[in-house]
Amino acid sequence: MKKKTGYSPYPPAIFLMGPTASGKSALALHIARYLPVEIISVDSAQVYRHMNIGTAKPGPEALAATPHHLIDLIDPHEHYSAARFRTDALRTMREIADRGSIPLLAGGTMLYFKTLLEGLSELPSADSDVRAAIEAKARKSGWPAMHQELFRLDSVSAERIKPTDSQRIQRALEVFYLTGKPMSETLRKPKNVSLPYEVVKIALVPGNRQALHQRIACRFEQMLKHGLIDEVRAIRDKFYLSDENPSMRCVGYRQVWMHLENATDALRMREMALAATRQLAKRQLTWLRSMKETREFDCLQENLPEQVKTYLLNTGLKFTEVS
């Protein structure tokens, strides 16, 4: 075993961030070969049980090789929030550090990384009665009308939310109904939060955007071959879901759902899924550019694993290399 000299009073943690199809999961497993890490999934879709193919969850071999956390937490009809992720992640990071291992947080849900680094404003928890009332009103009036109501109550939030984004409209209205204050006002309050870890932030970015798009297309074809359509059909039938459930708004699942509802043919489903995934990757890269003190690596380089290994083992942090 070889120890490196570190100067931070905090235990180390690694953030491995990147757009979809950038190779985060494979790289995380490679890091586990030489550092004593446990992997924490930072993926808002992998929290759902039964959603395996379309979320590219690690398989049995990967799970057996390295401990993974924050996967398969809830059923597809349930809700999961950034606030709950922060609570779950901080608890899990502490447990991993107490075991003498390194928390390696890998994923593409940039909002979750942001909440860990910056904390969350004190928004109220979800209220099932209020949500039910909002949904009932939306069924009668439509979400564009609910967006107009939000504009009247909280114009700042309404300007940031599309009239078709029912999930965010509902949340903004819910916060106003519960607190009597616009959500935008609460979000402006300062957050004094310090993450008690010495974090190494790694960002995987494509040197060639078209090459990433090709990866996205190949991966989606593999998902279809492995039974994504049957997976969505089984989930829909078992849990009596609608397309308003957050789980079914995940990229890929939403487009397959529309196909199963005969709203699109197979070719159009593919086109829509790929377009949505490319847009997701674009948003993820925008988030990454706003991250400070981040070391970028080209995710398309063949020697990426060795580049990252060299970097991690020379950070000066208190890593214990696996012999």
UniProtKB/Swiss-Prot annotation:
- The top EC class, named as a word, is transferase
Per the record, the GO terms for biological process are: tRNA modification
List site positions: Interaction with substrate tRNA.
109, 131
User: Does this entry carry the keyword DNA repair?
Assistant: no
What are this entry's molecular-function GO terms? ATP binding; tRNA dimethylallyltransferase activity
Q: Which domain of life is it from?
A: Bacteria
Q: Which SUPFAM superfamilies match?
A: P-loop containing nucleoside triphosphate hydrolases (SSF52540)
Task: State which Enzyme Commission number(s) the record gives.
Answer: 2.5.1.75
Q: Provide the binding site for substrate.
A: 20-25
Q: Which Pfam families match?
A: IPPT
Disulfide linkages recorded for this protein, renumbered to the chain, are: none
Name the family the entry cites. Belongs to the IPP transferase family.
Q: What is the annotated role of this protein in its UniProt record? A: Catalyzes the transfer of a dimethylallyl group onto the adenine at position 37 in tRNAs that read codons beginning with uridine, leading to the formation of N6-(dimethylallyl)adenosine (i(6)A).
Name this protein carries in UniProt: tRNA dimethylallyltransferase
- According to its UniProt entry, this protein's organism is Nitrosospira multiformis (strain ATCC 25196 / NCIMB 11849 / C 71)
Q: What is the lineage of its organism?
A: Bacteria, Pseudomonadati, Pseudomonadota, Betaproteobacteria, Nitrosomonadales
